[in-house]
């Protein structure tokens, strides 16, 4: 059973890729986007060092991640309850957002208390990542992205890493 938070994230992600979505602007039915998708996202899976993906050339920019609102529905720098000045300071996640952030893991404060679209579309160090190859249909086995040096989603080879600290979860 999935949480409401995870269902919301999946709904947002699938709205972009749902086949023949009524909001489709341009469609190409004969091709797969699997290769492009694998270039954009990190290596999440049981054996991330044996996977290919997460190319450094296709990462969301910091400017793009700044455009997402806080959980209060306003820009980060306008939210009076959100500490914009400390957004790059490291904070320990103590499980107050179990469906968005890895439990008891440190990440920057900018990744806390953001709107659902941020967690649906953007991957980062310390995020949770629910997808088709999770070990079960429950969040207890959800993937987490850990991209520091020597960690599962850290730099692998000459071009399998993120230059900005962020990945695209779904095109």
Predicted regions and their residues:
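An aromatic- and glycine-enriched ligand-binding surface/loop that stacks and positions planar moieties
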Residues: 1-153
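Active-site beta-strand/loop architecture of penicillin-binding DD-peptidases
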Residues: 149-171
């Amino acid at each position: 059973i999935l949480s409401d938070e995870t269902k919301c994230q999946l709904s947002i992600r699938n709205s972009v890729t749902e086949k023949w979505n009524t909001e489709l602007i341009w469609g190409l039915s004969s091709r797969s986007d699997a290769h492009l998708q694998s270039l954009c996202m990190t290596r999440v899976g049981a054996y991330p060092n044996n996977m290919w993906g997460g190319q450094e050339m296709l990462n969301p920019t910091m400017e793009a991640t700044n455009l997402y609102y806080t959980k209060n529905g306003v820009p980060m720098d306008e939210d009076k309850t959100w500490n914009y000045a400390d957004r790059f300071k490291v904070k320990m996640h103590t499980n107050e957002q179990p469906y968005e952030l890895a439990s008891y893991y440190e990440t920057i404060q900018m990744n806390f208390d953001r709107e659902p679209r941020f967690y649906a579309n953007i991957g980062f160090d310390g995020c949770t990542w629910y997808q088709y190859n999770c070990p079960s249909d429950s969040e207890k086995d959800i993937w987490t992205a850990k991209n520091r040096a020597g960690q599962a989603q850290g730099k692998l080879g000459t071009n399998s890493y993120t230059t900005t600290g962020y990945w695209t979860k779904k095109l």
